[in-house]
Amino acid sequence: MFSKLTNKFKATPTLFYAMSIAATWANAGSFLNGITMSQGSGILPFLLWALGNTLACIVFGIFAPMIPKLRDVFRSKPMKIIMGIMCPFQCWISMNGIQTVFADTVLGPDVGKLIALAFAVFFIIILFKYGMIRNVLTDHISWAAVYALIFGLTVVALCTSHGNYVNLSLGADGVGLGIKNCLLLIPGAFLYPYYFELLDYNDKNEDGTKKIRIRTAFIGGGLLFGFYLAFVFLTSLAVFNPVQNIIKAILVTLVAVSSLSSFQYSIYITFGRKLGLGLNILTAGLWQLLIPLGVMGAWTLMASIRVYIVAAAIIAAFVWHFVEKRRARGAVLK
């Protein structure tokens, strides 16, 4: 199956890239936080949050290939360290999501923990061995399943609610917070090592994969993610029964493992295969030990300041470009 998919991917990679881009951005929180936001904060804050999420990959795809020296800045050691530190937290968010969603089922959180660890170990091995292509293909398969499952779950859950839907407020008083969340989300994709690797992978074309207009893939990825969020909103109206909670847990697991694999691969990209392998094993092994200590508070801080990190990186890229340009002009005059 993978050999046929590999050949198809190499010949027409645009949709595969777009699905992988959407899958990487999703994370477990996109489903769980989306429902919590629409039910707790209201429709308008959810729509603003969804807009920020949809635009994030699109903005990256349009501007990252265009800004001179930006890739060089993000390849620098300080930026690699910053992005590398963020990757384990992203892995833990995915693993936490799997455990949390199974806690609402008869299977319980312990089963969720084992499932999360099993997927983490599986992807550590498969990505170490096969790299980029396997990550793109597994994202494609899992995300296709996500669309099928979320469509079916939404339709069934709304029908079985028999009109007894969750009452969502307009949330006009939360518009200010919604705008803030939207603006904080938009630059977030610039701190995803996997997205920069996709740019380089498309440019190098070392394994014969067809080179494409990569902006199209990122725009497609953003739109695909927005389409997924439309179903998240609809599911927030429904009341789930125990069977549907299990289906929901499977859905969130599929969403979470797509992001989990991309961030595990990002650790390999950032630190190299050998050191990356060790860090991936530590990330999975220390998950249950570190989470009770409150380490996710550090992630909350990093997420809130990432807009400043990205802004500083973009300014540094322009300064670097103009300094080099000035030096080159000076050398010509001499």
Where are these regions (language model features)?
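Hydrophobic alpha-helical segments and their helix-loop junctions in multi-pass secondary transporters
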Residues: 88-115, 122-172, 186-188, 234, ...
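Transmembrane helix-loop junctions in multi-pass membrane proteins
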Residues: 28-39, 44, 67, 90-105, ...
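Residue-level recognition of pore/gate-forming positions within transmembrane alpha-helices
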Residues: 24, 53-57, 87, 120-124, ...
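C-terminal membrane-solvent junction of multi-pass transporters and transport-like membrane proteins
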Residues: 2-11, 137-138, 274-287, 300-334
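Membrane-interface "cap" regions at the ends of multi-pass membrane proteins
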Residues: 1-32, 127-137, 143, 149-153, ...
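Membrane-interface helix-loop-helix modules in multi-pass membrane proteins
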Residues: 8-72, 183-188, 195-255, 290
